[in-house]
Structure formats: C-alpha cells, structure tokens
Amino acid sequence: MRTPIFQVDAFTTRRFAGIPAAVMPMNGFLTDAVLQAVAAENNLAETAFLVPQGSDYLLRWFTPTTEVPLCGHATLASAAVVMERLEPGRSTVVFHSASGPLTVTRTTLGYVMDFPARASAAVPTPPELAAALGAEPIEVVANAFN
C-alpha cells in the first residue's frame, strides 16, 4: 500500500519553524498497531490520520507511544493538507474525532479552529507535584483530558 505522508509545520509561516506534525490521509483506518507503528517511525510529537466521511473527515492522533484524544497543532496541519493539497479552494473542513466535531476555517488572516471547551475543576494536589515544585500550589485543576 502506498499513501502520502505530509509533514507540516503548524503555527508558523516560515519553513523549519513552528510545531511539526505528520499528516497521513487514508481511504480507511489501518489497525491501531499499524497506526502506532507509523507514528513511532515518524517520531514527531503527533501523527494525524484522516479518512474521508462524506464531505467531512474522521481524524485520529498518535504520539510515538500512544493515541491521544485531541491535538491542536496536528488538527491545524490536517486542515492545511485538506485545504491546500487534497481539496484546493476549500475554506472549511469538519473533522470528527474522539473529542467530538472540530471545525477549521481558512480566512484571509489564516486558520480559525473551533475546539470543544472542557470545564475544569479543582483536584487534590498530587504529592509528587508539590515535591517537584518545592512548594504547595495554590490550586491544581484538571479537565476531562487529565
């Protein structure tokens, strides 16, 4: 099987700057083990895998060691691949992910991402955090991703 892999530097207009992410468009997701192996081979913070679903895309992200529920820079990189390479001229794309639908729109100023808001709540301070900081934090908060 041959499929392109794009490496995109997100959050920059300069080459070799920003945050790199790999983007791999596919016709269908391969097994989790294969996706994980591809991400490990890329050895970037995240590799995004996208599959068309109607006019939208399914989107998953893997680090070199695990799948993650949400990744901003790899979503932005995926949108750039869709709008600049796969469907030139397209100005909005919706990705369906483990975190729900994510919309990215291209404007004259750049890309705008609409991401879910996750409520945070105070949690007990982990002893190892206080030890590492050398002080007791005023407050520690977590959300659904912690």
Residue ranges and their predicted role:
Residues M1-L70, L76-N146:
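Active-site proximal loop and beta-alpha junction motif in alpha/beta enzyme cores
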